């Protein structure tokens, strides 16, 4: 065989031993023993160092610590070994024949060399990465060893602290209860000198007595057992045999605890008492201490209007069963969740030795109103004057003359239907007077009552030509109920038929005695049209206010009364408020009835925006969440939380009141049965008004129209424009929508036209009430009136083949008409009622027969007639009723 290799050619040769990665983890098994003969086998892994290289000699053991302390530098890159080029003599001796390489062989060798260089670069890169990884791993191992040492020291410190605590507790218990137990033996039967074994643990295996690799990996697993050090020959580590466990003594405490690195390395030591054992001992000591008599705790128990037994027991720090036992002694059987009243709760709490503080849900309103002011902080304020009287007696005209305004021309129908508040400055004294104008119509009783409540003085306007009228008497009663003085203004004295003296005399009937007749009521004759004696009227008002000595504190939080409220489309809920005490400012948090809000703007009676309003100043307030009720009291609170408490309580009261009214009406079945028996008809209505006062007056007037046969049923009533939801509600109940000084929006009008719902608009309350009255009158059943025509007596009965039985009669009185209603009376008993179908005189049909004449009669669908019967003839008239 001829060798084709060229002598002296450089060939690529690989090392005799391939480059491999040996497993760096050696495993061993060690058995750990626990209390009560329990044991556990734990697999211990020993991680060795990963080495990259050939068959170089092993590193000496002395250099091992160096590896732990600093990272091993990267080994040199492994390069393929090259064979030395043989000399020409060697080639001659070998007998090889050399020849020149072909082009293909050269290219193949070049490719192999290039691949070898690429592999060399890749192996060098991998070696560098491995060196970096080993360095990082060594840093992590070092940190874990340090952390394990810190945990071991902390565990030893905790054991020492627990032993010291137990020793102190045992000493204290012996002092208190005089236990006869020897001091050397604690309560669990173990020797008292266990502190020597717990405080001086066995020296742990140091890293100098075993290879660093094992020490570095010891912190990787807390469950790893101890390893036997490696022998001189450097053999693999073998697990140490498990230590022998002493026999468990009867009565010994259970040795339970968490397995940590320290406990695993010191498994052959005597283990200390567990935490659970210490807790049980503490509980026993507490049980002994509980036998001592305890001092009774007396608490102040807050008792609301209703409280459950469980809550009462919690507030008294008593057991609920004790409270139930006391209730059983009083003859009341209750469960733990039952609710008892405040009186019963107070009796139980006082019997148990506690003090009781009674509270109510209405306590949230304490401090809102009627807070007494310091007399040193009060200042004089303007008087509030309410103008009252009968309709068309000139109340608004008198106010216009005082204000130099013209409000009457803007009123619909020339009558006042809204309550208004204005402020007038006296030209002589310069003092300001607040006037409140009230409607005089009978429907606005509530408005007049509100005006009398918030006023200081009442001006009773009486027309000199009309005298005292019903609403005049009502105004007098309102003023007397409010306890305010009256000034009588006799108006329209410029008329020819004016009789002021007659007015003064008529007032005497209602206990109003003017000064000219020896009384104490001031009267002034005025003319609003000619502005006569207006200065005298203002002078009397100022004099009366001076006698009242009106003072208030302006620097306190504001209080007032809502005179009127409405829902403005552009501004939202708007309330006309008369400030009575304090100063109302923009930004204040206010509460009125069940509504709250923050003052966004204040508008005076002249239409100007103001920043604040003092006492006796009427303003429009913007910023409520919803329109309050007219007559609600307004107050400023400190924060929104308090405002929410007050409004939620008032809303709850309002719901309860509405529910009680519904409950009084009875159940649905009772209402339906009552409807069937009485036959009462309802007229469904939806009412929308511009302000609360007008809505209140309309509802009151409609309620008065109801009778036992027909009544107005208000499906919905509110303030604001007519919306599409109102039309939808009206469609469901076939109701009529009434709008007072409001209009329907575009969508609502289109929906009403599409569904055939009638919407009626009114500006005068008289017209609204009259139209509803006429519509309700149409639901009334008409009245039937009988008109007697005459009587006839049957003389003989004839049988006619074509007609049947015909009674031959004589008319005794009156007349008998054909087609009239008749009654057949036999022995003074009505036996038949019907109509007269046939009336003949001789053989002719006639319309009527006069008294004294004879005729023939036949009834519709009745033939049982006898001689001697009496026939009554009468006519029924239908009369339409009205309310």
UniProtKB/Swiss-Prot annotation:
Biased composition, class Low complexity, residue ranges: 57-66, 191-217
Summary of the function given for this chain in its UniProt record: One of the essential components for the initiation of protein synthesis. Protects formylmethionyl-tRNA from spontaneous hydrolysis and promotes its binding to the 30S ribosomal subunits. Also involved in the hydrolysis of GTP during the formation of the 70S ribosomal complex.
Region called G5, residue ranges: 527-529
Domain of life: Bacteria
GO cellular component: cytosol
Location of region: G4: 491-494
Family: Belongs to the TRAFAC class translation factor GTPase superfamily. Classic translation factor GTPase family. IF-2 subfamily.
Entry binding sites for GTP: 389-396, 437-441, 491-494
Region (G1) location: 389-396
Biased composition (Pro residues): 72-87
Residue ranges, annotated region (Disordered): 1-96, 132-259
GO MF annotation, one: translation initiation factor activity
InterPro entries per the UniProt record, alphabetical: EF-G-like_DII, EFTu-like_2, IF2_assoc_dom_bac, IF2_II, IF2_N, P-loop_NTPase, Small_GTP-bd, T_Tr_GTP-bd_dom
Subcellular location: Cytoplasm
Location of the region described as G3 in the Swiss-Prot/TrEMBL record: 437-440
Name of the gene this protein is made from: infB
Start and end residues of each tr-type G domain: 380-551
Protein name per its UniProtKB record: Translation initiation factor IF-2
Sequence segments annotated as region (G2): 414-418
UniProt cross-references to HAMAP family, sorted A to Z: IF_2_B (MF_00100_B)
Compositional bias ranges of the Basic and acidic residues kind: 132-188
Protein keywords: Cytoplasm, GTP-binding, Initiation factor, Nucleotide-binding, Protein biosynthesis
